């Protein structure tokens, strides 16, 4: 993963499945509604991610940690302001906005060392809204792809065997 033109030392993305999506609806007397998305952006950082300070109860299984591997498949979406007509739509730099949203997403993912993914998503949304004034709302999904140390699954009650086979 390149951040500010340089390879990041511990953040990576998988090239190939990332998809750029647009949804557009035009209604007479209402205008043009456009939603843009980035889907299937698979990223991983090997350090610089924490998960602590959360509510704990009898259902809590994962321990707090101040440094962990974070891997996720990012889905980011943004809703544009309502456009009055096709001429307004043509005047917008959609490519520039997509690049700004993607660059912000990658940079914050790689560099932010927050206590949770939720805090990181908030920062991403805030920066995109500031960078592209024609965007009204931003949303993210960053589901965790967990990587456990050997033995952790047994502690969580997820497996019976004490051996692991890698393939």
Task: Give residue spans per PLM region.
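N-terminal intrinsically disordered, cationic/polar leader segments
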Residues: 1-99, 103, 107-167
